[in-house]
Amino acid sequence: MKFAVIQFPGSNCDFDLLWAIRDVMGAEAEFVWHDEKSLAGFDGVLIPGGFSYGDYLRCGAIASFANIMPEIKRLAKEGKPVFGTCNGFQILVESGLLPGVLIRNEGLKFVSKWQVLKVENNQSNFTTEYAKDALINLPIAHGEGQYVADEATLAELKENGQIVFTYADENPNGSVENIAGIINKEGNVLGMMPHPERAMEELLGGADGRKMFASLLKNFLVTVKN
């Protein structure tokens, strides 16, 4: 199974993401520049955090029109895994691959710290290695992470079990329903503001991110082989 780690101008978590999936988890992965027009040969996509295009206009807005995006949408439509963290999550909502929008933090300040999350749905392809209602600790680092959506969208997210992670001990950005991460209806696209790729080794502060990548590899490897 081979992953494309997409690089945009301003990405700064790309090496973390590559290290997590390749060096720690043992999967095949390589960088793909945003201006490429093909993802032939790849079985999944990882979109890193950072400040794509300097966060001009809106976070993720310009990146959503990058040349590589039609290919990312193609893989998503084919049921291949697509994961976006932080700015990657912003790109996924701006491109329409996930519902809702991410706006400026409620406190109007950049927040950088370790954050306790609750695993709301451990039956998704990205969370099966976690226990239901497990509390995990992952880093966050963002200024525009407040997730908002209309009532109809929120009702649909709840009904379909698309709310995968919520903020547990406190809400750091004002996200509605404490939402920290969601999946699409089909279950193959996950976006989240926290950074699991930064929680892969106890030596570095914690390893709660490992199970997210382990779930991804376990569940999608079967799909790719079939």
Swiss-Prot record:
Q: What is its EC number?
A: 6.3.5.3, 3.5.1.2
**Coiled coil segments of this chain:** none
Q: Which SMART domains match?
A: GATase_5
CC annotations in GO:
cytoplasm
Reactions listed under catalytic activity: N(2)-formyl-N(1)-(5-phospho-beta-D-ribosyl)glycinamide + L-glutamine + ATP + H2O = 2-formamido-N(1)-(5-O-phospho-beta-D-ribosyl)acetamidine + L-glutamate + ADP + phosphate + H(+); L-glutamine + H2O = L-glutamate + NH4(+)
Asked if the keyword Nucleotide-binding belongs to this entry, the reply reads yes
One Pfam family for this entry, by name?
Answer: GATase_5
Annotated GO molecular function terms are: ATP binding; glutaminase activity; phosphoribosylformylglycinamidine synthase activity
Q: Which HAMAP family match?
A: PurQ
Protein name, please? Phosphoribosylformylglycinamidine synthase subunit PurQ
User: What species does this protein belong to?
Assistant: Lactococcus lactis subsp. cremoris
